[in-house]
Amino acid sequence: MAEACYERWEGRGALGYLTLAAICEGQLEDPPDAARLVVAHDCFPTGMLGYWGRRLADGGLVAALTATSPPRLGHPDGGPKLAGTNPLAIAIPSSDGKPIVSDVSWGRVTYGDVIAGIARDDELVPFGGEHAHKAFAMSLGLQLLVDALVGGGYGAVLLVARPEADPVPALRVRASDVRLPGDA
């Protein structure tokens, strides 16, 4: 289903990487006039969302992208696992060719770290110590946002837009020599 400001992609169980590759290519080939919401249903895993955000920002587009995964995070006080690590990536293009790309997962470790043997499954808890409720709240909010738009199964939601301004160069001047999100 596609309209000027909305697209729904059916992953049909495909790897999220492949689905997001096709979605990003589609947005770069036919960018929105202003903004577009893209919903991808039935695709998992999506991997590091900042990669896809950077591709869009390198193409001159603003992007906010989140995706769901199997429930791996419980409430910081204990109980059942209620949400995935549900990353959020935000990418802002820049006329200087160096976009800002923020990519955060809400778990102390990622599930990819567990699969790679770098971390243990019991380390999949909301990050933040005594403030872990904030990471849990964000993860749960993103889970429900995607669930509400996808309608069942795993998926991803992308907001992609043409920028109205170019804030990154001024930020880089103010930041001086500080490393910013997405810098190598």
Task: Mark where each language-model region is.
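Catalytic-core signal marking the mid-to-C-terminal active-site face
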Residues: 153-184
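Active-site cofactor/substrate anionic-group-binding motifs, chiefly glycine-
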Residues: 1-29
